Amino acid sequence: LTEETKYLINDYSISKMKDGVMIINTGRGQLIHTNALIEGLKNKKIGSAGLDVYEEESEYFYEDQSDRIIDDDVLARLLSFNNVIVTSHQAFFTHEAMENIAATTLQNIKDFINHKPLLNEVKK
């Protein structure tokens, strides 16, 4: 996510879309301004939405919250629409993705042990 792509989907961009558009986001939660998405759903400009990400997801998406009341009113409102599905960061969870994650992790461990450059090293 960059400053240029943050809230790429917003009130203005939604107003330029065809009526009844379907919005899918499996990238980054902050690509979509959630309140603008909700307004688009309410006024039927947006026909449906499929979201694997949410801009405030860290509080809700990484552990079981089924025994807890959602205190994020924006997320609760979003979940109230029958034409919205939120999959809580599950789109990545495929056999191929898990194999790639495991292979990358093992390669990084091997490279670290052998004092080779790490392809996925995050530097401060």
Where are these regions (language model features)?
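Short donor-sugar binding/catalytic loops of nucleotide-sugar-dependent glycosyltransferases
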Residues: L1, G29
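Rossmann-fold NAD(P) dinucleotide-binding segment
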Residues: E3-I23
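Rossmann-like dinucleotide-binding domain for NAD(H)/NADP(H)
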Residues: G20, Q30-K124
